Amino acid sequence: MRSLAILATSLALTAAVVSAKCDPTKWSPPVDGQYNTTGRIDPNKLNVHLIAHSHDDPGWLMGVDQYYMEKVQYILDTAVEELVRNPDRQFMFVEQSFFQRWWHQQGSEVRGIVKQLVKEGRLDLTVNGGWCMHDEATPHYIAMVDQTAYGHQLLMDEFGISPRIGWQIDPFGHSATQGSLLSQGVGFDALYFARIDYQDYGQRIKTKDLEFIWRPSKSRGKESQVFTGEIVDTYCPPGKFEYGNIGNEIQDDADLHDYDVCGEVDQFVKTAQSRGAVSKGSHIFIPMGCDFQYDNSLRWFKNMDKLIHYVNQDDRLNVLYSNLSYYTDMKRAEG
């Protein structure tokens, strides 16, 4: 009897501590296990576009085949499964050297599902689209054009699509050739990258010029210009929002001692607001992915579902699953 009393007291104290830290009644729970991830633009708030992606170098610390066998095939397998689970979810995949290998190993059922996801824009293959994400310093421009054209031709043959967004997030430094010939020149509406000189980056932070119109060719002038964006910090998520890491999960079970939806929401809101403060307009994007992430796509999407569900109840931000084409359209519409 005494042990039952001690247990009851312990549970009461735990509930009191949790309640004092974060009141669970403040938040609407998921309905029938489903989180509200419906995405729409709110003109009166900062709109945060979550871009789910995996950066997959065809050869880095391991060889191409090792990466495919140990990581990439599972990234694509599980990403497709999770997109099917929730029609609001989106995922971007870039490196055609990996995608085409995976594609040719799929049966008719999976191919049909993938074609539908691509048609809906939820499996986004319209970003970069080259065989790899080429370096911009050492390759000859012909090699850059060839590998880009090869990837684009495969996408046109299989899906009838042409990439419209440049995504050069890992090359160190960016050339006029990329900006002119391989961005505007191939029909890209925008180019995004993540590695520029730290002094340039610092100045653009101060002046809110991380996104700008780049005219890489003086002789061609406006004909060569392309909307360009430098990513804040890195192409990986900020802080604990990298859900591929164990321990970063959102704990929203109010019966457990580490329940802290309030803290998760507040940290994300402050992070997004700090990025909004160095950007122009009412739209920012946060890349949700990193090197060879999403081999367990459920971990990522389940936590992003929770993030969207709870942050949008907070009323300080509007968060949605998105893709770079949609984000670019929203930025261009703002002028």
For the regions a language model picked out, list residue spans one by one.
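Cleavable N-terminal signal peptides of Sec/SRP-targeted secreted and luminal proteins
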Residues: 2-20
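Catalytic-domain carbohydrate-binding cleft regions of carbohydrate-active enzymes
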Residues: 19-335
